Amino acid sequence: LHASLAPSEMCIRDRVLVVGIGPVGLMSVAACKLRGASQIIAVGSRPVCRQAAKYYGATDIITYKEGPIDKHVLDLTNGEGVDKAVIAGGGVDTFDPVIKCLKPGGKIGNVNYLGEGDYVNIPRVEWGVGMGHKQINGGLMPGGRRRIEKLADLITYGRLDVKPLLTHRFDGFEHMEDALMLMRNKADDLIKPVVVFSE
């Protein structure tokens, strides 16, 4: 939640695009809602994640399987585009359509690990030929006790419900490997597994 919130600096009434609605993207959707985004467009295809994105506040959900992301976003925003974007999925080619639907002065927060590809390609014209004031920030969530306490407070005081993320429950430490293998194999109905240790 915090990693996706900070890089693209969402503000009240922003139109925001969240690409990739796995656990990190879903928390990005939740962060956008908490920060007062007026329109939250989520990109994803798995039904369990699309349902969770709606729960967390996505106003629109699109899929890259039905055509270019930028065209969908521009249609949904009457040609205006979005103020901010979070890239939480995809690859090096994801930046191209996101930049194409980002308003001048817009910001992209990348929280996606780019494990393949040599270059991130930036479309020159849609980048404002270098003069569009479009920014890309990327990074991991900063650590520290204070940050974790603030995030825990969101759960404690009912501002954030993480239950929809927990799609698979395992009881006992002996099932840790089962949970990890489930994450590795990425079952269609998986968001996050949880392993519960008995007292």
What are these regions (language model features)?
Residues 25-26:
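N-terminal Rossmann-fold NAD(P) dinucleotide-binding loop
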Residues 18-21, 33-97:
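Adenosine-nucleotide cofactor-binding segment
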Residues 96-99, 144-199:
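C-terminal hydrophobic helical "lid"/dimerization subdomain
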Residues 106-107, 122-165:
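Rossmann-fold dehydrogenase core element
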